[in-house]
């Protein structure tokens, strides 16, 4: 199933929204599958774990470039940028070898200590628009609360894969 950035970002000297589209045959077979009402609450995480243990996954990473500010507003994420008029263009391929994506000690470490924030990137990839400016404030407050609840003073930013508590 495709995933989209919703909001706009700098893309070097350009402005773009991003999309990630499955390329693998096994991934494409999952399109159109649904969760049943009586499925267990952890059905998605368990299915993802089983799938990633047994399958390599490949995605097309695409950019939809801003070409017309009137039709592609940056400040109103409620306006969809027309894909027929302004198509996504592939800029990279992302591949993940089969792996256990739900190792308990890694999940706890990630949940308790890591923060994911689009404002931590390069200026060339800076988040744009009012939604992202609001996210900057909300993410900072959310991080503070999460650290306090989890009993930590600060989040960590691993300098190398050796600091990650998972086989890589």
Protein language model features and the residues they cover:
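Active-site-adjacent core segments of small-molecule enzymes
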Residues: 1-168
